[in-house]
Amino acid sequence: MKKMLVVDGNSILNRAFYGVRPLTTKDGFPTNALYGMVNMIRKQTEATGADGLAVAFDLKAPTFRHGLYDAYKAGRRPMPEELAEQLPVAKELLAAKGFHVLELAGYEADDILGTLARHSGSAACTIATGDRDSLQLVSESVNVLLAATKMGRPVTDRYTPEAVREKYGVEPEKLIDIKALMGDSSDNIPGVAGIGEKTAGDLIARFGSIEYIYDNIDTIDIKPGVRDKLKKDRDMAFLSKKLGTINCDIPIDSDPQSYLLKAPDNFKVTRMLADLEMFKLIDRLGLEISSAASEPRSEEKPVPVCAEDDFDQLMTRLKSDGESYFLWDGEKCRFDLGDKVLVCDCENEGFYPFFVKLLEDRNIKKYTANIKSLYSFAQGCSALCRNMCGDLELEGYVLNPSASSYDALRLAGEYSAAVPTESGDENDCAAASLRRLFAAMNKKIEENGQQKLLYDIELPLARVLSSMERTGFAVDRDGIAEFGSRLGERIADIEREIYSLVGYEFNLNSPKQLGEALFDKLGLPAKKKTKNGYSTDAQVLESLENKHPAVRDILEYRTLSKLRSTYCDGLLKVIGEDGRIRSTLNQTETRTGRISSTEPNLQNIPVRSPLGREMRKFFVARPGCVLVDADYSQIELRVLAYISGDANMIKAFNDNTDIHTVTASEVFDMPPQLVTPMMRSRAKAVNFGIVYGIGAFSLAKDIGVSRSEADEYIKGYLRHYSGVDKYMHDVVEKAKKDGYAETMFARRRYLPELTASNANTRAFGERVARNMPIQGTAADIIKIAMIRVYERLERENLAAKLIMQVHDELIVEAPENEKERVSALLKEEMENAVRLSVGLVADVHSGRTWYDAKG
């Protein structure tokens, strides 16, 4: 053995538990500590290149230290239940990974670490821990990787003898003398009363040990008060040294060769990680779920895998079954026939005629994955997809919107539906699992009451999104290029102005050089400093905006540079030959149910600044057409009124009064006619702040008032809208009881954060519990509206096309002679998407460009 890694299991697991956000399986079993621990040990193993590895754990039983001092570790809080549940699983998982797991009655994990380190011989030994006690073990052949938190971020510091000397001013073995004097409240080691870390460190740096100090207590040069304290607690000092000293000679096998890494049981590791729903970790460790799936259950034989090119025979079989389960990736198409898997080569000249015929057959139910891609394929063939009954990705998303992915094989592992195949190929195993997997997922969807969400919203929406992606959005290429040039000229002017104000040229895009210019050269007050230099983030610069004109110029420089690089240069790269941009519309990316847009993100075109809004001038209708733009008015507030049942809010909406003016009138105790624009603006911030779950601190920052003022605004709001206040309380309590929050259409978001030990994490969970039903319901409503608009356009044989969705806004490209009809259609379908206790209102406008239609 050349290198040995010795891990403090309890310490690393504990750090992972508090450092990783709460994670649970769908059944509620906590997994965050396990996830963090495996990742941390993996990184430590790679960093050290260890060929030997042992993980040490504490036992619950008392140790020899309790025999020395009854109060040792007294008062320490018990391990949180969510962490205790993960401890035995952690040990089993580490053993399956081929690591040596050690624990010994009467001793602590530290003693195991010390003994293995002391006897590591010629092997370089690294101790991985989050406990500084292990620093006493550092030597020329023993280093410590200390996991810590700095500025809210996890870091790992390597301690060599030199690093210990530099930080503490003493040799590593003398750290225990410092602890003997200062004590350790976390372990209830008493030390000498009144002696703190600074005094203890100074004494040991000068005199070397407590033995020397006490042997010469009356003659050494120390303050009289310190001498008195030392004399008074002499026995406690020596007891504390015994308690804090790691025993490096306990009765365990200390031969380094006994701890060589063993071959991992990859099947067991994969099974365990799949059961824990850690599918990203399976990928990261280079494992395959198919390796677990290929291990047959005792009663189950692997199914055969056969190549198929007799498409007439296959069609006859599928017609007879009345259903088909398949996975198509463009190269192969695999069919699960129950008793076998048939693999079709897509390059076979007979495949696509057969496949199109299958997709169009209204009598054969189709169960597959990513039906959006199939709709797109069929549209490209001038064909139709009929009777699409199941999509693994959409069903997985409906059941758990927080999952990392919805890959078929991963879902099979998650729902215990994996079927082994004779080939052992991952894709074959995924296909073989389809029937069993759909049965398991459909049963769960039915149990959750989510059939309407799946069958009336998500499955039909896939066809709409496919059409929108294929249609795309026309843009003015020359206009974007010219706008980018104008931005470039303005950016160059700003650069020159900044250099003139600072007095020299530097790289404006270098945070380090910018920090030096602002804080060293100009002498502005530094707010934050990182290990790489001064912080120059937006928050810091905005706080300095009135301190020097260069800061305003820098903020403008950043805004314009992003506008040019992201929205001018970026968009020019993705314009198709036909002058249209085609964004990918993602149906399974957000936890609230919202649709997202990527490659490029057209939902993120700037709207806050006049210059940003100008980008919308370059999104145009094709010749002879106009853009008809419709967006919901205050949909989230209307949803809040409905789900809270607040009488005042419902009345305000149904009376068609301005909700922000009404709120301002109540919050500021002012007749509506006397409400000023500033009052209305602040009331608007309160209205939407309640929806998004922000508190007084964030509201104060947003509207520029004191925290106490913001708190009064919120209290005034909740006094007037008492139904909202009750909803905010009740919905959190319900989420705590159920483990999830849900929309009016039964879309769920599971919230393990609500049971977290960390107060900040729990507070985050409560905010999500309050706003997810509002945001999620609004997202569901716009999806229903999209389906209604798309089907109505199709049903009435209109040439107009739905081309974009931006949160609460829909955009249709329509021939000029269809403009009025499409405008009326959009308004009607959006306002009648659902029936609430308050009416939905859609504002409709049109124009040649997105800017003209929306502004």
Regions picked out by a protein language model, each given a short descriptive name:
Residues 71-85, 142-170, 227-229, 389-432:
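Short alpha-helix plus adjacent loop in nuclease-associated cores
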Residues 470, 582-583, 587-590, 665-798, ...:
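Conserved catalytic core of nucleic-acid polymerases
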Residues 337, 393-422, 428, 433, ...:
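Function-dense linear segments that define catalytic or interfacial modules
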Residues 4-5, 9, 15-54, 70-71, ...:
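Conserved RNase H-like, two-metal-ion catalytic cores of nucleic-acid enzymes
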Residues 489-496, 500-552, 719-767, 771-773, ...:
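C-terminal polymerase-core module
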Residues 233-347, 360, 366-369, 429-607, ...:
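Conserved "right-hand" nucleotidyltransferase catalytic core of DNA-directed polymerases
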